[in-house]
Amino acid sequence: MTTEKEMKQIQNEFKERMDEGELLNCMRCGFCLPSCPTYIESGFQETHSPRGRIALMKAVADGMIEPDEDVERSLSLCLGCRACEPVCPSGVKYGQLLEEARDIIHQNKKHSLGERVMRKTAFHELFPHQNRMRSAVSLIGLYQRSGLQTAVRKSGMLRVLPEHLRTMEAVLPDVPKSKDMKHRPRFLPSIGPMKKRVAFFSGCLMDTMFLPTNNATLKLLQLAGCDIVIPPEQACCGALHGHSGEKNTGKELAKQNIAAFEALDVDAVITNAGGCGAFLTEYDHLLKDDPEWSERAAAFVQKLKDFSSVLVELDFHQMDLALETPQVVTYQDSCHLRNVMHTSLEPRQLLKSIKGAEFKEMEKADSCCGSAGIYNIVEVEMSMKILDSKMAAVKATEAILIVTANPGCLLQMKLGIEREGLSGKVRAVHLADLLLEAAGHKTS
């Protein structure tokens, strides 16, 4: 429970740090309401809408209300999907307001011992250190390959876990071997004439748990005519930190990544995870008040592109792409790829170019799936409501292949498939893996 002293400090910092001009930009028109999943799934509660949350932020900053548990609950229930931003006639940067508010609350509130341990372990000891990430993911691999997973499942021990965690265990990808995660290339030449020289942002989860997808992305870029530089000094993007009130750690990771990429002579910096790419894209905002880093951040941001944009730019979709077996395919937008990186047409263009892939657009493909980083772990009830609505839209397309471009979305869609009893009938894949399959190559 937040104390009076803590609430007073939070209120003072809202007044000092929240962007008054941005808060006032909200005209309360309500254009954002139909795009907000939590507003809809909460039964149209105003406090769970972008407009309502901005009103609460403004009221706290003006001293009209205290930043009590109700305010904190409203802000924590937001997915941060930012679907409200493209439809806002005033161009309110809602995501930036939300992250600032969450950071203020986190920095000034006393957390339970369990939460402090969890945050320190995940945000400070694990994600920023790639060697530790590899070790942690290797333990999951050991669990999967040693026979322990089979024994645990047969014993019924998983029944002690909440249902969503049992299902999550069932949909975890097969983890790569430790040696494959350790030995990563620093340079890969184009296959055929070189058209672009690019750098690749590997990510932390993407280069461990989802390593085959990173390998697929690299192979696609090579086939499209890219020389690829992969700087080993790069780090976690900091997205989970920024979204969870760990802004200072996010800034340090941003500086490490800018330093790793800025000296490279490349045409673009490529990402293949919507959540990572979106946070990288906003490094200029994150470091805008730092005189040493603001210009460097702005220069870095200018080079960022999703891999799908580069593939279309290099006419990869004109290649002979085909599936061995004709399949109905649908696409679930990564919220941050669509709403922050403004990349939605290119993935569809690539999918529609695959022979044997009958593309069917699902209803509200641009609406969040409920993953939202760690939201599906900390806000289970709302996340599953949103997922159930999403799976109803998927089933209406009769697709047997759900494609997305973000690891969190991918796991969430696999979770939805498992919950709906569609395992073995429907599969979820990352766009890069499907494209490599369609190009006649195996994902390694």
Curated annotation (Swiss-Prot):
[4Fe-4S] cluster 1 binds at residues 26, 29, 32, 88. Its main location: membrane. [4Fe-4S] cluster 2 binds at residues 36, 78, 81, 84. Keywords: 4Fe-4S, Cell membrane, Electron transport, Iron, Iron-sulfur, Membrane, Metal-binding, Oxidoreductase, Repeat, Transport. It catalyses: glycolate + A = glyoxylate + AH2; (R)-lactate + A = pyruvate + AH2. Pfam families: CCG (PF02754), Fer4_8 (PF13183). The glycolate oxidase likely consists of several subunits including GlcD and GlcF. This is Probable glycolate oxidase iron-sulfur subunit. It comes from Bacillus subtilis (strain 168).
